[in-house]
Amino acid sequence: MTPPPALLNAWKLQMIGELGGRLNCHWQVRDGRERAVLRRWYGLEAEVKYELGILNLIGGTGLHLPTLRRGPQAVDGTWWSLHDFVAGAPVPREDARRRGRWLAELHARWHDLPLPPARPGWSGVWAVLSEPAADALLDAHETASPADVRLYRWHLHRARTALIGIHFATRSPMLIHGDFTPWNLRMQRGVLTGLMDFEFARPADLMEEFALAWRGIHDDVVRGYADHTPLTDEDLALLTPLWWAHLLGGALRDLERGIQDDGWTARRLRVRSPLMGELAAPYPD
C-alpha cells in the first residue's frame, strides 16, 4: 500500500522515498522545508495509541525520537501518522560493547519514569515458559513436525529448569525498548543521539531487554551494559532462558498457524555463547 494521495494533500506532504519497515511501513516526506516520516501502522487503534503514549512518556529524556507531528488518522481502516525524522548514522554492528553501555545509560534515563500499562496484545515471554498450553501445542504437532518439536521441547525444558530458584516476585518491571539493535539507533560524532522503532517497548523485566540486543551472540552488549550497571548472578541466569523464550514464542505461534520453520528459529536456538554457562551444552541431534 502506498500513501493515499488525499492524505498527502491534506497534510501538504511531498514524497521523497520509501524507508521500509518490518510491520509498520515508512516513507520519507517533506513537510514544508523539513524532512519527516510518514508511517502506516500495522496494528489496531489500541496499539497505535499505546506506542504514541510511550513516545510521549520518554519525550524529555534526551534523545531525538520520531515525535508525533500529525495524526493518527484512519484512512480506509488503516492508521497513519507523521513523525519527526531522526537524523544520524546507524551504530556499527561490531561496536557491541558501546551499544551495551548506551543501553545501560538509556535505562538510567528511564528509571524514574512512570511505568506504563501492559502493551495491548502482548502475552510476554514468561507465558511460553510457564503455561501448559505450550506443552499441549508441541504435543499436538509432534507427528507432523517431529524434528522441530523435539528441538523446541528440549530448549523449553532446559529453560524451565534454569529458572528454578529465581525469585520473580522480588524483581521489579521497568520500561524497556525491546529492540535495541544497531539499525534502531542513530549516532552523530560517536555519540548516541537518536532512537527509533518502539514496536516492542513495554514494561518488562530488565533482562527481557537483552533478547534482541544480545541474540545469543553479541556478548559484548552484555559486558558493556555491566561496565555501566553491574548485573547480578540472578540477572545473568535469566539471560539465556529469556532469549530462548523469545524464539520459542515465535515458533509456537507459527506452529499454531501451520507455518513451517524455514530454519531460522532452529539455527538461532542452536547458537551457543560463553555467557550461557551450563545452558551452552550443545543440542543432542
Where are these regions (language model features)?
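Juxta-kinase regulatory segment immediately upstream of eukaryotic protein kinase catalytic domains
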Residues: M1-M15
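A conserved alpha-helical element in kinase catalytic cores
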Residues: R39-T78, P90-E105
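ATP/Mg2+ or Mg2+-diphosphate-binding catalytic cores
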Residues: V128-A144, L151, G250-D285
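Active-site acidic catalytic loop and adjacent metal/ATP-binding pocket
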Residues: G20-R33, V37-L38, L68, R160-F210
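A cross-family kinase active-site recognition segment
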Residues: V91-R150, P173
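Active-site activation/catalytic loop segments of kinase-like enzymes and analogous catalytic loops
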Residues: L206-P230, A245-D262
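Residues forming the ATP-binding cleft of Hanks-type serine/threonine protein kinase domains
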Residues: V86
